[in-house]
Design a protein with these regions (language model features):
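Active-site beta->alpha loop and helix N-cap motifs at the rims of alpha/beta catalytic domains
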Residues: 1-26
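Beta/alpha (TIM)-barrel catalytic core signal, keyed to glycine-rich beta->alpha loops juxtaposed to Asp/Glu
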Residues: 19-147
Length: 147
């Protein structure tokens, strides 16, 4: 498996996330090695997960040097697994959580989505947008919740 950490270091990325394909293997030895490489380059190490109920406890129990966690998190529970359990887990831990899929692949409007995120321990959000209309609607609603 190829790990493209060096190119991200060269372009001066501030945070470098391990892809979910790596994080969700929950291989402590490999994960520690990659996170150490990121930290030793002076970057903030993070991990993405598509299986938060399995991978976040793995991160926490192994005391991994992971400052930020990117996970699916949205009002409808899409892509989250057990929504209530993920909410409880996120709200109970001190990590910089970043929500992905906050609009549940277009099933939730930004107006509905962002207040929900603001009720939980979500520090940032990443949203896929295609049209100018989507950009304006999403950014306008995000500014109302995230300051």
């Amino acid at each position: 498996m190829c790990f493209l950490i060096e190119p991200l270091i060269k372009i001066d990325a501030k945070i470098i996330f391990l892809h979910g394909a790596v994080s969700d293997q929950r291989n402590a030895e490999l994960t520690k090695l990659l996170l150490s490489k990121i930290r030793s380059a002076g970057k903030v190490p993070g991990m993405a997960t598509h299986y938060p109920l399995q991978t976040i406890p793995f991160i926490h129990q192994n005391k991994l040097d992971c400052s930020a966690i990117l996970l699916p998190f949205n009002l409808k529970g899409e892509f989250m697994g057990n929504q209530k359990a993920v909410e409880k887990l996120v709200d109970s831990l001190d990590y910089f959580f970043i929500a992905m899929k906050p609009l549940a692949a277009g099933k939730i409007s930004p107006k509905e989505a962002f207040p929900y995120l603001g009720e939980h321990n979500i520090s940032a959000v990443t949203v896929g947008m295609v049209t100018e209309e989507e950009i304006l609607e999403t950014v306008t609603e995000a500014k109302k919740v995230f300051k």
